[in-house]
């Protein structure tokens, strides 16, 4: 049994997660989170909010998971959101074609369907299931289609990402931020992709959770005011050049920007914050790297893009976060289709005076002549360059109708004007987090086995703030004189907002092992000494050491242990084993 099987078996058995619809045989690409998994997921999301909503001051919004067709036409999902697919001609099994050549090409995403099929043929790749011949590769759109209302007049789609809701709400968000850049919006929620062959547990799902931030910035200024906070962080970077050599480089964030490895300070800042967040939820630093997209795999509109990748036992390096400079693509795409103005007026620090040549129509003549059409005609004339004002007459087209205007009715003057700012279409920096993938990574990176007393102890070494249970309250025996004081301690933890578990079933050793397996950092045992002197034992999950503390101080001590304000060995009197 490899580590992936060990983790997924533990997750099912202990109530973290399991395949959906088990009663009816299940469906690939869907997973349910059990009691412990739902708690773990919520804590991962809450720490994300602590970083990006509280730490960065970004506004959290919530948008529908169904979108109208126009949204995805503008975003490009209708025409370009697809994966390459191939089908076995014998058994009819369907595969994602680029996954079949991963052992040949490190990043097959950049290849066209034709190139992938050629590699399949050249390398004699056959159906993994039956060895049959594979069909030609074709593109399969990954969006789930539905209808909004009865009939098919108003098609809709389950959103493939949370990001579009933030772009659609740009004008309202801009107003919320008092018409000034930069600002950010975040959303945590469900997204949907009709994956071709989801076979990797929660790593590849058809319904999954995302946490995304869209940071709207002035395209002329890509420096970050808080860059000094992260510039000395050392990251393991797998840049395009490093990928050519096949060797990860470790360097500071500041050096990466100075050398032009990461495009600019703002992008580097969010790469660094992503690193800090992933460590805060329990991702192993030694199994974490940031890989830069190669030029041929990066979206044509992107300026730079980095993926946070983690090393998993069975699956190798897997992307769990993407951090991209998407330039102004998203807002310009929605501007083009919606005709809405998604630009921002950015004030200069000081007004500047500029001279320019202005075209001035003679409205005393044009007004009476064209009446209601005069303003539109004048606007069209003013938009013309001086070079276009040649000849005795000027031809212009307004609303599909052509007009001839005498040249003498248009004058050209040099004017000086005060310019207080200019309109810009913001660029977008997008850190996009796959919550389900992060959760599985935390499970696998926290999983440890060690021999203890002729048996193998399994322990999930969650960080204290991540564990789905903060503390377990365990009466030494299921007897009233021990259960009642234990229950009072349990109730006090609950009143203080801490997640406590009360357990009387089985021997105390068995209960310790059970809490090791689910990652509970501390177990409090109420024994007969408690009845004599009011003290209880506290057991540390990772070291299995025990101390005695006063029962009345249990909540404060556990809280300080979890926050790191108190060291376990100094929190009470050691218990001799």
From Swiss-Prot:
Q: Which UniProt keywords apply?
A: Aminoacyl-tRNA synthetase, ATP-binding, Cytoplasm, Ligase, Nucleotide-binding, Protein biosynthesis
Keyword Transport appears in the UniProt entry: no
Disulfide bond residue pairs: none
GO cellular-component terms in the record?
Answer: cytoplasm
What top-level branch of life does the organism fall under? Answer: Archaea
Catalytic function, reaction form? tRNA(Gly) + glycine + ATP = glycyl-tRNA(Gly) + AMP + diphosphate
- List positions binding substrate: 96, 161, 208-212, 430-434
Q: Which GO terms describe its biological process?
A: glycyl-tRNA aminoacylation
Compartments, record wording: Cytoplasm
According to its UniProt record, this protein's enzyme class is ligase
**GO MF, one annotated term:** glycine-tRNA ligase activity
Documented EC number(s): 6.1.1.14
The reply to whether Aminoacyl-tRNA synthetase figures as a keyword in the UniProt entry is yes
Q: One matching Pfam family, short form?
A: tRNA-synt_2b
Which positions are annotated as binding ATP?
Answer: 193-195, 203-208, 319-320, 434-437
Q: Which family does it belong to?
A: Belongs to the class-II aminoacyl-tRNA synthetase family.
Its biological purpose is as follows:
Catalyzes the attachment of glycine to tRNA(Gly).
Record protein name field: Glycine--tRNA ligase
């Amino acid at each position: 049994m490899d580590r992936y099987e060990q983790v997924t078996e533990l997750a099912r058995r202990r109530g973290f997660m399991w395949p959906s619809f088990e009663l009816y045989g299940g469906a690939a690409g869907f997973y349910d989170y059990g009691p412990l998994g739902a708690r773990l997921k919520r804590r991962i999301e809450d720490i994300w909010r602590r970083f990006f909503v509280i730490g960065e001051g970004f506004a959290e919004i919530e948008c529908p998971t169904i979108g109208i067709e126009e949204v995805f036409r503008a975003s490009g999902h209708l025409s370009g959101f697809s994966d390459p697919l191939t089908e076995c001609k014998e058994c009819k099994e369907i595969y994602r074609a680029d996954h079949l050549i991963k052992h040949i090409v490190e990043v097959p995403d950049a290849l066209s369907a034709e190139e992938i099929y050629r590699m399949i043929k050249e390398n004699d790749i056959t159906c993994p299931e039956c060895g049959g011949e594979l069909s030609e590769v074709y593109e399969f759109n990954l969006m789930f289609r539905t209808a909004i209302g009865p009939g098919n007049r108003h098609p809709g789609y389950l959103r493939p990402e949370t990001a579009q809701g933030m772009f659609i709400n740009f004008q309202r968000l801009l107003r919320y931020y008092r018409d000034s850049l930069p600002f950010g919006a975040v959303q945590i929620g469900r997204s949907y992709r009709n994956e071709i062959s989801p076979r990797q547990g929660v790593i590849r799902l058809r319904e999954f959770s995302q946490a995304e931030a869209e940071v709207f910035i002035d395209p002329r200024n890509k420096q970050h005011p808080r860059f000094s906070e992260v510039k000395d962080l050392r990251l393991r970077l797998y840049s395009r050049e490093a990928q050519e050599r096949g060797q990860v480089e470790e360097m500071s964030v500041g050096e990466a920007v100075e050398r032009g490895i990461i495009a600019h300070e703002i992008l580097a800042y969010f790469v660094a914050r992503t690193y800090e967040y992933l460590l805060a939820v329990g991702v192993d630093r030694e199994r974490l790297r940031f890989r830069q997209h190669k030029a041929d795999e990066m979206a044509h509109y992107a300026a730079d893009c980095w993926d946070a990748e983690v090393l998993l036992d069975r699956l190798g390096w897997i992307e769990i976060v993407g951090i991209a400079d998407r330039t102004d693509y998203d807002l310009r795409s929605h501007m083009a289709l919606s005709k809405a103005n998604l630009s921002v007026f950015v004030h200069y620090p000081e007004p500047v005076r500029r001279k320019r040549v202005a075209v001035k129509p003679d409205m005393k003549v044009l007004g009476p002549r064209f009446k209601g059409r005069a303003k539109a005609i004048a606007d069209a004339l003013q938009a013309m360059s001086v070079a276009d004002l040649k000849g005795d007459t000027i031809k212009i087209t307004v609303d599909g109708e052509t007009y001839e205007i005498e040249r003498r009715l248009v004058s050209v003057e040099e004017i000086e004007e005060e310019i207080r700012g200019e309109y810009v279409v913001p660029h977008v920096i997008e850190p996009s987090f796959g919550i389900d993938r992060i959760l599985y990574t935390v499970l696998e990176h926290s999983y440890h086995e060690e021999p203890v007393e002729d048996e193998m102890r399994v322990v999930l070494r969650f960080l204290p703030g991540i564990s789905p249970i903060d503390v377990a309250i365990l009466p030494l025996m299921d007897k009233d004189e021990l259960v009642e004081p234990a229950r009072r301690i349990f109730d006090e933890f609950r009143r203080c907002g801490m997640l406590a578990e009360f357990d009387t079933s089985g021997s105390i050793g068995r209960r310790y092992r059970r809490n090791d397996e689910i990652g509970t950092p501390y177990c409090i045992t109420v024994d007969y000494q408690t009845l004599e002197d009011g003290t209880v034992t506290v057991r540390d999950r990772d070291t299995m050491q025990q101390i005695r503390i006063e029962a009345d101080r249990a909540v404060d001590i556990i809280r300080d242990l979890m926050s790191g304000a108190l060291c376990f060995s100094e929190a009470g009197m050691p218990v001799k084993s």
